[in-house]
Amino acid sequence: MQIVWIGTSICLGFIILMLDDRFYDTFAYAIYALLLLLLFATIFNPHEIKGSRSWLVLGPLRLQPAEFAKFATALAISKLMSTYGFDLSKWKHFASACAIIVLPMIFIVGQKETGSALVYFAFFLMLYREGMSGSFLFTGVAMIIYFIIGIRYAEPTIWDIPTSVGHFSVLLMVQVFTSALVWVYCKDSNTAKTIFGYCVGITIGSLLFAEYVIPFDIVWVQLILCAAMVGYLLYCVLEQRIRQYFFIMLFALGSITFFYSADYVLNHVMQPHQRVRINVLLGLEQDLAGAGYNVHQSEIAIGSGGLEGKGFLNGTQTKLKFVPEQDTDFIFCTVGEEEGFVGSAGVLLLFLALILRLIHVAERQPYKFGRVYGYCVLSIFLFHVFVNVGMVLGLTPVIGIPLPFFSYGGSSLWGFTFLLFIFLRIDAGRNLVRT
């Protein structure tokens, strides 16, 4: 069946290349609206496959609109950002770009496909290339760090003090990160040193007092320090009228709020299978026969491949079906077992070459539409490769996204074909523009 999908993908690629490159610019919003309609309709689809309502069943044909919504979203946001007068530094324009990204994510989450929805965060890499402040990416990374450390080390305590290592570490990081942001974005080294000095100094003093004098939970001291830090930043906002202080204050408040809501999200918002996967990834649970089975078997398969592998179709772990999803989400473990380190490295080098080529082609576009779309394609490919390989190696959560052009499945193959070949057609049209 995969041969059929490959053949139809070649035909699709040919059709895409035959269309005028201006077609994709002209009908970007229409394509986006059509895919949003399909995503919305899929939520009410009675056909549930593997616990997901993300499939449209048309007779013998089964398609996932979420895979096609990626290129539609890329076209729509490229159209928006290439309009005259668009300025990403303006909040109204930035909010419009975010809305285009978030809207399909909402519909996809409604289909119980959280993993596919997370792919759309990759578009923020494109926004960063087009001028979005790096503080947004920093905030996202910081929240991930808070979540991991706060959940992973919630139980262990510091020495004999009734203080959680996770809570202590996260609140200390909030104080340090806030000081660093004041230094970098406000160019105010004195305020940064004041915040850092008081917070770290009092925290260390409280730690020593609790260890050698009276044991107590020093998290309360840290919370008081964070409140004082926020109050001081508010004073700077009112006194100096510098808006950067306001955003840094929001970062501090948001960090604390996010951290204390992480446990609630894990236990009450996430689905049971998602919660177990995260606990297994963080080492809080050992479920080798359940949620951790695929990852454990894929690690065995890759490790057993050695340097040169066992040979094509000679993998024992994959051939004997120890890895259930070896043709789709975990196909990289098949490469690792059969072709070894050499084959795995070769595949990763091919993806690296593709990503570097996409950067080169995107940068040479004469119009903003082509450049933005190119970086959308690049971001999606980068996210898929990083997360897919990471989850096979047990480094990232298992969220069920395919490896581009490797994993079995027609929807993903068609989706990546649309993504890449539309960009090739846009690039081919640049020479016509220059002549």
Regions found by a protein language model. Give the residues of each.
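Hydrophobic alpha-helical transmembrane segments of multi-pass inner membrane proteins, especially
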Residues: 1-289, 333-391, 418, 422
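Membrane-interacting alpha-helical segments
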Residues: 304, 368-373, 428-432
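Transmembrane alpha-helices of multi-pass inner-membrane enzymes
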Residues: 177-181, 394-431, 435
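Long extracytoplasmic/lumenal interhelical loops at the membrane interface
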Residues: 299-302, 306-339
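Transmembrane helix boundary and interhelical junction motifs in multipass membrane proteins
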Residues: 113-118, 309-315, 326-328, 399, ...
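Glycine-rich, flexible loop/turn motifs
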Residues: 45, 52, 59, 274-277, ...
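Glycine/serine-rich anion-binding loops at beta->alpha junctions
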Residues: 60-69, 111-112, 306, 398-417
